[in-house]
Structure formats: C-alpha cells, structure tokens
C-alpha cells in the first residue's frame, strides 16, 4: 500500500499558485517588490507591523457579500502565528522558489512572500495603504 504524502509547503504553494493564476495579482505584487509602485515593500511591512498596531487600524471589507470589520494588526499577528515567519514574510528571505510568469518567463520569490501578499491583497491592505499614503 503506497501513500502519497504532501508537505505543508507543497499544499500552501499549490493554493498560492491558484490564487496568483490571475496575472494581475502577481503583477501587482511585482510592482511593489520592484519599486514601480508609489508604495514600497518597506512601507507595506511597516504599516502592517507598526502603524496598524499603534493606530489600531480597522476598516470594513466585504467577504461573501458580508461586511466584516478587519483589524489589520490583529489579523497580521494571527497569520504570523499560524504560518511562522518562513511562510508569511513580505521580504524574499529563506528558501527561494521559481514560479512561472507570463510570456514564458519566471520569477524568483518565496512561499512566505507570496503568502504575505495574498493576505495583503485579499484583505485590501495594499489598497488601504495606497488610498491613505
């Protein structure tokens, strides 16, 4: 009897690649990482870890037609605790992976960076920063 086991990283990566299957999401992340956006990677990190804590940043987000109150710092800490720094980090630290991109190109990133930006995009953190920066 042979069983196929999948690691947590493989499961997370599969889920992340499905999320980033829409090129616009990956492009949005890359613009920030490559310095082509009005906000920088450091600003996104600083907002999530410092500003949101000090100013208790809260706003409404819509999920499944319901409006929910989103507490940026509280949710950030919950994700960090659930995933650990290796799997939830805005910077390209730890083990790098190569993922396919458009026009037969690829990009190097980490699972942690992809996961952090998924959180930031899904919960309108990036949009909030852009609107208020």
Describe these PLM feature segments:
Residues 1-88, 99, 111:
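Long, compositionally biased non-globular segments that serve regulatory/targeting/scaffolding roles
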Residues 76, 104-108, 117:
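Conserved aromatic-histidine-acidic binding/catalytic patches
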Residues 88-89, 93-101, 105:
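IQ-motif-like calmodulin-binding regions
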Residues 100-102, 111-113, 119:
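Alpha-helical bundle/repeat cores within regulatory domains of eukaryotic proteins
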Residues 122-133:
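Long, highly charged low-complexity segments enriched in Glu/Asp and Lys/Arg with interspersed Ser/Thr
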């Amino acid at each position: 009897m042979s069983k196929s086991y999948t690691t947590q990283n493989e499961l997370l990566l599969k889920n992340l690649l499905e999320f980033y299957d829409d090129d616009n999401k990956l492009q949005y992340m890359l613009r920030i990482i490559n310095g082509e956006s009005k906000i920088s990677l450091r600003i996104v990190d600083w907002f999530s870890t410092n500003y949101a804590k000090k100013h208790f940043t809260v706003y409404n987000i819509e999920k499944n037609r319901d409006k929910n109150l989103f507490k940026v710092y509280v949710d950030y800490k919950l994700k960090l605790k659930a995933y650990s720094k290796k799997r939830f980090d805005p910077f390209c630290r730890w083990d790098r992976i190569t993922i396919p991109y458009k026009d037969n190109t690829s990009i190097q990133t980490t699972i942690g960076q992809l996961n952090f930006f998924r959180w930031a995009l899904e919960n309108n953190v990036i949009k909030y920063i852009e609107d208020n920066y």
